[in-house]
């Protein structure tokens, strides 16, 4: 009892619900305290609806069936719930780590709320897992992660003119994929008189974003004439690394990227991080892991290569309630435009 009270006071806990044990907390501590003889009593009498924006630790012996508390809280407001198993993510991460050298860095892509897992919680988890870099799509996502005290380097894929200052305010590293974006960032850096680390994207054949071959000389000229831009990495993205039908094209992308990296780095006299492999590339083109690899959907157990080399665990479980079950006769139709037919 005393040991438990000491832990509670040390961890700045705001509320304690005790079930099946007698616990006397000093009312002067300001901790909200309630006590129940059984899980069933707690379910009947506690007002779970008042729990909002809270981090809840459920701990106890299996005999108390605390999973009933979890299920009840999960279903209070949302009848559809996406559960994320962080143990599975950890095991998937370790599976990929076995495929790369100890010296190879890992950039975890946590865009779109970490594919539904929650970008802040995922970032905190990956920080504990000793990930080297995070990548997000938007500055807003990066700011949320920074606000949760993550100190990991964060690359931002897409930046806008109206939020450039946030790059310096939150120590973020933008992807630079065109001369226009480069000039905007450089102009802002010069106005602030503050250096910024950036990631140069080369278009090796995906033809979405990135510097084309004829733009590289101007890129080198601009970077060579400023002290305000630090090239943290040079990278590219493979179009179809998961599909062996396109292996020749993938190899041509890698070969072009190697040449572009050499041209840029040697011209500038720098040695930035070099990376081109995405999740599928780690499995199928392992010899090109270079300085860093980028992991996305693979962390959640999705392997687009369908490789037999690795065994991943699905980290997401989507749970929903069935609203209604009907019995209808053969040849009857269902839904809009009568699209379903029995």
Positions of predicted regions on the chain:
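Active-site anion/phosphate-binding pocket segments in diverse small-molecule metabolic enzymes
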Residues: 83-85, 90-98, 105-108, 141, ...
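Residue-level signal for inorganic ion chemistry
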Residues: 16, 20, 58, 145, ...
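Active-site loop-to-helix "anion-binding N-cap" substructures in soluble metabolic enzymes
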Residues: 18, 23, 36, 62, ...
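Active-site-proximal beta-alpha core segment in soluble small-molecule metabolic enzymes
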Residues: 83, 87-91, 104-273
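Hydrophobic residues within beta-strands of alpha/beta enzymes
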Residues: 16, 56, 134-135, 154, ...
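Glycine/Thr-rich phosphate-binding loops of Rossmann-like dinucleotide-binding domains
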Residues: 26-27, 65-67, 144, 164, ...
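ATP-dependent carboxylate-amine ligase
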Residues: 1-91, 98, 137-139
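Active-site regions of enzymes building and remodeling cell-envelope glycoconjugates
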Residues: 29-41, 152, 171-174, 290-293
């Amino acid at each position: 009892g005393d040991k438990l009270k000491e832990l509670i006071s040390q961890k700045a806990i705001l509320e304690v619900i005790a079930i099946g044990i007698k616990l006397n907390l000093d009312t002067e501590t300001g901790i909200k305290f309630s006590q129940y003889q059984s899980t069933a009593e707690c379910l009947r009498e506690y007002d779970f609806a008042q729990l909002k924006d809270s981090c809840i630790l459920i701990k106890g012996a299996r005999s108390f069936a605390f999973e009933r508390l979890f299920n009840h809280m999960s279903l209070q407001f949302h009848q559809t719930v996406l559960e994320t198993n962080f143990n599975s993510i950890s095991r998937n991460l370790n599976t990929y780590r076995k495929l790369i050298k100890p010296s190879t860095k890992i950039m975890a892509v946590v865009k779109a709320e970490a594919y539904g897992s929650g970008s802040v919680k995922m970032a905190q988890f990956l920080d504990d897992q000793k990930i080297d870099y995070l990548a997000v799509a938007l500055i807003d996502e990066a700011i949320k992660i920074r606000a949760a005290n993550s100190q990991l380097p964060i690359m931002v894929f897409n930046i806008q003119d109206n939020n450039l200052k946030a790059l310096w305010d939150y120590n973020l590293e933008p992807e630079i994929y065109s001369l226009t974006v480069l000039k905007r960032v450089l102009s802002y850096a010069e106005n602030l008189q503050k250096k910024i680390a950036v990631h140069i994207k080369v278009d090796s054949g995906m033809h979405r974003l990135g510097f084309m071959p004829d733009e590289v000389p101007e890129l080198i000229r601009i970077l060579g004439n400023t002290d305000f831009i630090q090239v943290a990495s040079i990278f590219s993205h493979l179009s179809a690394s998961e599909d062996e039908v396109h292996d020749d094209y993938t190899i041509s992308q890698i070969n072009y990227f190697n040449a572009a990296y050499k041209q840029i780095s040697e011209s500038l006299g720098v040695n930035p991080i070099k990376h081109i492999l995405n999740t599928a590339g780690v499995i199928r083109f392992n010899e090109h892991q270079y300085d860093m690899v980028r992991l996305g959907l693979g962390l959640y157990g999705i392997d687009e290569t369908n490789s037999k080399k690795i065994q991943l665990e699905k980290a997401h479980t989507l749970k929903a309630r069935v609203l209604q079950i009907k019995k209808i006769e053969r040849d009857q139709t269902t839904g809009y435009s009568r699209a379903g037919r029995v």
